[in-house]
């Protein structure tokens, strides 16, 4: 935490470093070992509209704890009532990019606390926050990784964060 409070829009206009949370929802499959739940961002989002993204993500509000922010974002975006102990912390990811959306520059510099959530999730039971999420879908982990790498699917997923998740899944799959 920097001790400096900025509104989200200001942080992205100035490119200020800020804290976020990233939650990856995964389940076992027979193909490569895992599926990841992807969200398709709303067409009205201020950045990367209509692109596929990780399961859930958001800013850490001033005064909030990181883990409570992760739990809040899962509830707000997907309607998932996760318990803090169900979120597996896997590390911090630094992400940065600049792009123009709707004729305005968007500058993102974030330190993301990354979590994996492995509790059962049924798409038909999710309550999507329409302002944020247009749709969700399961995709095989390796297929998704390849599409992100090749750029054959519109997305805003960091490849190096994808690798972080893969390393975590490799470690925990030994006990499967």
PLM features: residue spans?
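The catalytic Nudix box helix
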Residues: 38, 55-90
């Amino acid at each position: 935490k920097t001790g400096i409070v900025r509104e989200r829009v200001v942080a992205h206009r100035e490119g200020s470093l800020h804290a976020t949370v990233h939650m990856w929802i995964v389940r076992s499959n027979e193909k490569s070992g895992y599926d990841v739940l992807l969200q398709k961002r709303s067409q009205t989002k201020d950045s990367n509209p209509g692109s596929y993204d990780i399961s859930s993500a958001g800013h850490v509000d001033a005064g909030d704890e990181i883990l409570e922010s992760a739990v809040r974002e899962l509830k707000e975006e997907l309607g998932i009532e996760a318990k803090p102990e169900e979120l597996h912390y896997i590390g911090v990811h630094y992400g940065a990019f600049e792009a123009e959306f709707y004729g305005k520059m968007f500058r993102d510099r974030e330190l993301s606390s990354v979590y994996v959530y492995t509790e059962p999730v049924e798409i038909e039971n999710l309550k999507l926050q329409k302002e944020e999420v247009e749709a969700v879908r399961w995709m095989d982990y390796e297929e998704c990784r390849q599409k992100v790498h090749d750029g054959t699917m519109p997305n805003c997923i960091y490849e190096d964060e994808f690798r972080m998740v893969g390393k975590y899944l490799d470690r925990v799959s030994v006990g499967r």
